[in-house]
Protein backbone atom coordinates (compact mmCIF):
# COMPACT_ATOMS: atom_id res chain seq x y z
CA UNK A 1 0.00 0.00 0.00
CA UNK A 2 1.38 3.38 -0.97
CA UNK A 3 -1.34 5.97 -0.77
CA UNK A 4 -0.43 9.19 -2.50
CA UNK A 5 -1.52 12.13 -0.37
CA UNK A 6 -2.95 15.14 -2.16
CA UNK A 7 -1.58 18.52 -1.10
CA UNK A 8 -3.34 21.82 -1.47
CA UNK A 9 -1.62 24.21 -3.86
CA UNK A 10 -0.26 27.38 -2.29
CA UNK A 11 1.03 30.60 -3.70
CA UNK A 12 4.73 30.49 -4.45
CA UNK A 13 5.38 33.66 -2.51
CA UNK A 14 3.96 32.14 0.65
CA UNK A 15 5.68 28.84 0.04
CA UNK A 16 9.04 30.54 -0.42
CA UNK A 17 8.59 32.28 2.90
CA UNK A 18 7.79 28.97 4.57
CA UNK A 19 10.47 26.85 2.95
CA UNK A 20 13.27 29.17 3.79
CA UNK A 21 12.56 28.71 7.45
CA UNK A 22 10.79 25.34 7.12
CA UNK A 23 10.67 23.83 10.58
CA UNK A 24 12.76 26.68 11.96
CA UNK A 25 11.55 30.29 12.06
CA UNK A 26 13.85 33.23 12.59
CA UNK A 27 13.56 35.71 15.39
CA UNK A 28 13.10 39.38 14.70
CA UNK A 29 15.76 41.96 15.43
CA UNK A 30 19.41 42.49 14.72
CA UNK A 31 20.18 38.92 13.61
CA UNK A 32 17.40 39.01 11.06
CA UNK A 33 18.30 42.43 9.74
CA UNK A 34 21.93 41.45 9.37
CA UNK A 35 20.98 38.44 7.26
CA UNK A 36 18.18 40.07 5.26
CA UNK A 37 20.06 39.79 1.98
CA UNK A 38 20.33 36.00 2.20
CA UNK A 39 17.42 34.47 0.23
CA UNK A 40 17.22 31.31 2.33
CA UNK A 41 16.64 33.29 5.49
CA UNK A 42 13.50 35.18 4.50
CA UNK A 43 10.57 34.54 6.81
CA UNK A 44 6.97 35.67 6.75
CA UNK A 45 6.29 38.94 8.57
CA UNK A 46 3.99 37.14 10.98
CA UNK A 47 6.56 34.49 11.88
CA UNK A 48 9.22 37.12 12.43
CA UNK A 49 7.25 39.41 14.73
CA UNK A 50 5.09 37.02 16.75
CA UNK A 51 7.09 35.40 19.53
CA UNK A 52 6.87 31.64 19.96
CA UNK A 53 8.98 29.22 21.90
CA UNK A 54 9.19 25.60 23.03
CA UNK A 55 8.15 26.24 26.64
CA UNK A 56 5.77 28.36 28.67
CA UNK A 57 2.89 30.48 27.46
CA UNK A 58 4.31 30.71 23.93
CA UNK A 59 5.09 26.98 23.76
CA UNK A 60 3.65 24.32 21.42
CA UNK A 61 0.41 23.84 23.36
CA UNK A 62 -0.50 27.47 22.70
CA UNK A 63 0.92 28.10 19.22
CA UNK A 64 -2.46 28.01 17.48
CA UNK A 65 -3.77 30.72 19.81
CA UNK A 66 -0.87 33.16 19.48
CA UNK A 67 -2.08 34.57 16.18
CA UNK A 68 -4.61 33.73 13.48
CA UNK A 69 -1.75 32.97 11.08
CA UNK A 70 -0.79 30.07 13.37
CA UNK A 71 -4.23 28.44 13.41
CA UNK A 72 -2.93 25.50 11.36
CA UNK A 73 -0.95 24.42 14.44
CA UNK A 74 -4.25 22.95 15.68
CA UNK A 75 -4.90 21.17 12.37
CA UNK A 76 -5.47 17.47 11.70
CA UNK A 77 -2.32 16.77 9.63
CA UNK A 78 0.36 18.06 11.97
CA UNK A 79 3.99 17.02 12.41
CA UNK A 80 5.96 15.44 13.99
CA UNK A 81 4.33 12.08 14.69
CA UNK A 82 5.23 8.71 16.15
CA UNK A 83 6.35 6.53 13.23
CA UNK A 84 4.89 3.04 13.15
CA UNK A 85 4.57 1.07 9.92
CA UNK A 86 4.00 -2.67 9.94
CA UNK A 87 3.85 -3.27 6.21
CA UNK A 88 6.78 -4.31 4.04
CA UNK A 89 8.86 -1.53 2.54
CA UNK A 90 7.75 -0.61 -0.97
CA UNK A 91 9.72 0.92 -3.80
CA UNK A 92 8.99 4.52 -4.76
CA UNK A 93 10.51 6.65 -7.48
CA UNK A 94 12.76 9.06 -5.57
CA UNK A 95 16.04 10.38 -6.94
CA UNK A 96 18.74 12.24 -5.02
CA UNK A 97 20.54 14.72 -7.25
CA UNK A 98 22.61 16.70 -4.78
CA UNK A 99 25.65 18.71 -5.84
CA UNK A 100 28.52 20.37 -4.04
CA UNK A 101 27.55 23.86 -2.96
CA UNK A 102 28.39 26.57 -0.47
CA UNK A 103 26.76 26.15 2.92
CA UNK A 104 26.39 28.98 5.42
CA UNK A 105 25.92 28.36 9.14
CA UNK A 106 23.01 30.35 10.50
CA UNK A 107 21.47 30.95 13.92
CA UNK A 108 17.68 31.04 13.48
CA UNK A 109 17.01 32.01 17.07
CA UNK A 110 15.43 28.58 17.59
CA UNK A 111 18.13 26.27 16.29
CA UNK A 112 21.26 25.58 14.25
CA UNK A 113 20.72 25.80 10.49
CA UNK A 114 22.88 25.57 7.36
CA UNK A 115 21.60 27.45 4.32
CA UNK A 116 22.57 25.64 1.14
CA UNK A 117 21.18 25.38 -2.38
CA UNK A 118 22.88 22.29 -3.71
CA UNK A 119 20.77 20.12 -5.96
CA UNK A 120 17.35 18.52 -5.93
CA UNK A 121 15.24 15.70 -4.59
CA UNK A 122 12.92 14.21 -7.24
CA UNK A 123 9.75 12.42 -6.13
CA UNK A 124 7.83 10.68 -8.93
CA UNK A 125 9.54 13.03 -11.37
CA UNK A 126 8.71 16.23 -9.46
CA UNK A 127 11.74 18.31 -8.51
CA UNK A 128 12.20 19.77 -5.03
CA UNK A 129 15.20 22.10 -4.66
CA UNK A 130 17.30 21.83 -1.50
CA UNK A 131 17.16 25.07 0.52
CA UNK A 132 18.59 24.34 3.96
CA UNK A 133 19.02 21.81 6.73
CA UNK A 134 18.63 22.32 10.47
CA UNK A 135 18.76 20.37 13.72
CA UNK A 136 16.41 19.49 16.57
CA UNK A 137 17.53 18.04 19.91
CA UNK A 138 16.15 15.64 20.87
CA UNK A 139 14.43 14.28 17.78
CA UNK A 140 10.96 15.50 16.88
CA UNK A 141 9.72 12.28 15.30
CA UNK A 142 9.76 9.12 17.38
CA UNK A 143 9.78 5.47 16.25
CA UNK A 144 7.49 3.17 18.18
CA UNK A 145 7.53 5.72 20.97
CA UNK A 146 11.32 5.99 21.13
CA UNK A 147 13.13 9.27 20.44
CA UNK A 148 16.70 9.86 19.28
CA UNK A 149 19.17 12.41 20.67
CA UNK A 150 18.97 14.55 17.51
CA UNK A 151 17.24 14.86 14.14
CA UNK A 152 18.19 16.85 11.05
CA UNK A 153 15.65 18.14 8.53
CA UNK A 154 16.71 18.72 4.91
CA UNK A 155 14.16 21.15 3.50
CA UNK A 156 13.25 21.20 -0.20
CA UNK A 157 10.75 23.27 -2.22
CA UNK A 158 9.09 22.70 -5.59
CA UNK A 159 8.32 25.44 -8.09
CA UNK A 160 4.62 25.33 -7.16
CA UNK A 161 5.27 25.79 -3.45
CA UNK A 162 5.02 22.24 -2.14
CA UNK A 163 7.61 21.19 0.42
CA UNK A 164 9.49 17.93 0.85
CA UNK A 165 11.44 17.42 4.06
CA UNK A 166 13.91 14.59 4.55
CA UNK A 167 14.47 13.70 8.20
CA UNK A 168 17.48 11.78 9.52
CA UNK A 169 18.00 10.64 13.12
CA UNK A 170 21.29 10.83 15.01
CA UNK A 171 22.46 8.67 17.88
CA UNK A 172 25.68 8.85 19.88
CA UNK A 173 28.57 6.88 18.40
CA UNK A 174 31.43 7.56 16.01
CA UNK A 175 32.25 11.12 15.04
CA UNK A 176 30.39 12.38 11.97
CA UNK A 177 32.93 13.41 9.32
CA UNK A 178 30.42 15.44 7.31
CA UNK A 179 29.51 17.57 10.30
CA UNK A 180 33.06 17.99 11.61
CA UNK A 181 33.92 21.19 9.67
CA UNK A 182 30.56 22.74 10.53
CA UNK A 183 31.04 21.96 14.21
CA UNK A 184 34.34 23.88 14.26
CA UNK A 185 32.25 27.07 14.32
CA UNK A 186 29.70 25.77 16.83
CA UNK A 187 31.40 27.00 19.98
CA UNK A 188 28.81 29.71 20.57
CA UNK A 189 26.15 31.77 18.83
CA UNK A 190 28.81 34.41 18.23
CA UNK A 191 31.14 32.00 16.41
CA UNK A 192 28.19 30.80 14.33
CA UNK A 193 27.53 34.35 13.15
CA UNK A 194 31.18 34.79 12.16
CA UNK A 195 31.57 31.42 10.44
CA UNK A 196 32.94 31.30 6.90
CA UNK A 197 30.93 29.46 4.21
CA UNK A 198 31.85 25.82 3.63
CA UNK A 199 31.71 23.68 0.51
CA UNK A 200 29.57 20.59 1.10
CA UNK A 201 27.43 17.99 -0.66
CA UNK A 202 24.21 16.91 1.06
CA UNK A 203 24.58 13.46 -0.52
CA UNK A 204 27.32 12.82 2.03
CA UNK A 205 24.76 13.16 4.83
CA UNK A 206 22.59 10.24 3.74
CA UNK A 207 22.68 6.82 5.44
CA UNK A 208 23.43 3.72 3.37
CA UNK A 209 19.96 2.27 3.96
CA UNK A 210 17.45 4.45 2.10
CA UNK A 211 14.34 2.96 3.73
CA UNK A 212 12.10 5.77 4.96
CA UNK A 213 8.80 6.42 6.67
CA UNK A 214 6.65 8.71 4.52
CA UNK A 215 3.44 10.54 5.32
CA UNK A 216 1.64 13.87 4.64
CA UNK A 217 2.26 16.46 7.33
CA UNK A 218 3.22 19.99 8.25
CA UNK A 219 5.98 22.32 9.31
CA UNK A 220 6.90 21.55 12.91
CA UNK A 221 6.99 25.21 13.98
CA UNK A 222 4.60 28.11 13.39
CA UNK A 223 2.82 28.65 11.09
CA UNK A 224 2.58 24.81 10.99
CA UNK A 225 1.38 24.84 7.37
CA UNK A 226 0.13 21.43 6.22
CA UNK A 227 2.00 21.34 2.91
CA UNK A 228 4.86 18.93 3.58
CA UNK A 229 5.74 15.54 2.12
CA UNK A 230 7.70 13.91 4.94
CA UNK A 231 10.36 11.24 4.34
CA UNK A 232 12.05 10.20 7.60
CA UNK A 233 14.91 7.75 7.18
CA UNK A 234 14.81 4.56 9.20
CA UNK A 235 18.57 4.16 9.69
CA UNK A 236 20.13 6.66 12.11
CA UNK A 237 23.51 8.29 11.65
CA UNK A 238 25.98 8.94 14.47
CA UNK A 239 27.61 11.87 16.20
CA UNK A 240 30.35 11.63 18.76
CA UNK A 241 29.57 12.57 22.35
CA UNK A 242 31.59 15.75 21.82
CA UNK A 243 29.64 16.68 18.68
CA UNK A 244 26.34 16.03 20.42
CA UNK A 245 27.41 18.12 23.40
CA UNK A 246 28.44 21.01 21.15
CA UNK A 247 25.04 20.98 19.44
CA UNK A 248 22.97 20.82 22.62
CA UNK A 249 25.09 23.53 24.23
CA UNK A 250 23.78 25.97 21.60
CA UNK A 251 20.16 24.78 21.47
CA UNK A 252 18.52 21.97 23.38
CA UNK A 253 14.92 20.85 23.78
CA UNK A 254 13.92 22.58 20.54
CA UNK A 255 11.53 19.82 19.55
CA UNK A 256 7.76 19.92 19.17
CA UNK A 257 5.92 17.01 20.85
CA UNK A 258 4.45 14.33 18.59
CA UNK A 259 1.01 15.08 17.16
CA UNK A 260 -2.02 12.80 16.57
CA UNK A 261 -1.89 10.69 13.42
CA UNK A 262 -5.65 11.03 12.91
CA UNK A 263 -6.77 9.49 9.60
CA UNK A 264 -3.36 9.56 7.92
CA UNK A 265 -1.40 6.49 6.86
CA UNK A 266 2.34 5.95 7.25
CA UNK A 267 4.06 4.07 4.47
CA UNK A 268 7.52 2.53 4.70
CA UNK A 269 9.28 2.86 1.36
CA UNK A 270 12.70 2.20 -0.14
CA UNK A 271 14.16 5.17 -1.97
Where are these regions (language model features)?
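Anion-recognition interface
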Residues: 1
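Alpha-carbonic anhydrase
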Residues: 4-7, 12, 23-271
Amino acid sequence: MNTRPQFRPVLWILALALVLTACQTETAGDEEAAEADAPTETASVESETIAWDYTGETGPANWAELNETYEACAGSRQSPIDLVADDEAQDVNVEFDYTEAEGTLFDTGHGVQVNIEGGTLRIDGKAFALKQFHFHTPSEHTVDGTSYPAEVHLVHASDDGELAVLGIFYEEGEANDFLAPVWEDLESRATMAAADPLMMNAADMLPADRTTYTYPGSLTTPPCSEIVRWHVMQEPLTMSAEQMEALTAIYDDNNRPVQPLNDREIDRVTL
